Amino acid sequence: MKKARILIVDDSSVMRKIVERSLRQAGLEIVQVLEASNGAEALVVAQNNALDLILSDINMPVMDGLEFVRRLRNVENAKNVPVIMITTEAGESAVVQALSNGARGYIRKPFTPEQIKERIAPLLEG
């Protein structure tokens, strides 16, 4: 598994830290964790950094995760970066929309480090 540069997008700074801690507890090799509090900030980070993976919430102010994923697919250096949605969304419609916008999968909150590893490790192999 390669050492990864990961962007975590969530409007809660506490949740961003929980996700980062879970990534490390899962034993994933991480070079750098970048953070953004909404989709608009995340687009700027994605445009200016070589990323290996993005983990994004769906419900955020300014630009939600669904719009972020849709717009990310038009960013030349980031259009192929895998995105996993991390969400409390109980309904399937938001998840289906995220997948149709280009997300590679989703993880429901609350989650365990094992769930994080199961979903993310295959995307970081190579």
Model-identified regions with their sequence ranges:
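Two-component/phosphorelay signaling modules centered on CheY-like receiver
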Residues: 13-34
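C-terminal output helix
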Residues: 111-120
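Active-site residues of response regulator receiver
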Residues: 57, 87
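Acidic, metal-coordinating helix/loop segments flanking the phosphotransfer/catalytic sites
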Residues: 35-53
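Conserved Asp/Asn-Gly motif in the active-site loop of CheY-like receiver
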Residues: 33-40, 95, 113
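Receiver (REC) domain active-site loop signature in two-component systems and cognate sites
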Residues: 60
